[in-house]
C-alpha cells in the first residue's frame, strides 16, 4: 500500500482566540490554527501521571527518565493534602514529600510539570486527598447534595 501525504503550502492561520504566553525563563507556548508551538516549533504535549509522594525519593529520577524515554514530555502530579498535613497545622515537605525537589528534578530531566493542587484528588487516595482530621472540624459548613 502506498500513501501520499500532501502538506498544505501555506502557513497555518492564527488561532481564533489569541493563545500565547511566555514564562519567566523566556520560553513561549502558543497555538495556531493547526497545532501548538513551543519556542516557535511545533509541539505535541504528551502527559503522564506520577504521584511523587508515593515513591521513594531515590527512585524518582529513574522513573522520570523511563517516562521521558517513553515519549512523555510533561508530568502531571497531585499534591495530596493528606500527605503534607497529616496532623492539623503540622506540614511535612521532607523526603518523598519534597515538592520543590521533585519539580526541580523534572526540570533537570527535561520534563514540564502540571501541578494538580486539589484540594480534591482522584488518585485513589483516602478521603479524596483530604486529611483525616478535617472530617472532625466543626468550624465551617460542609458541602451537601441535600436540597
Residue map of PLM features:
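The substrate-binding groove and active-site-proximal loops of carbohydrate-active enzymes
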Residues: 44-57, 80-98, 139-147
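Aromatic-lined substrate-binding rim segments of carbohydrate-active enzymes
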Residues: 60-134
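Small/flexible residues
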Residues: 36, 118, 144-145
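An acidic-aromatic loop/edge-strand motif
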Residues: 2-13, 121, 125-140
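N-terminal carbohydrate-binding accessory modules
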Residues: 1-74
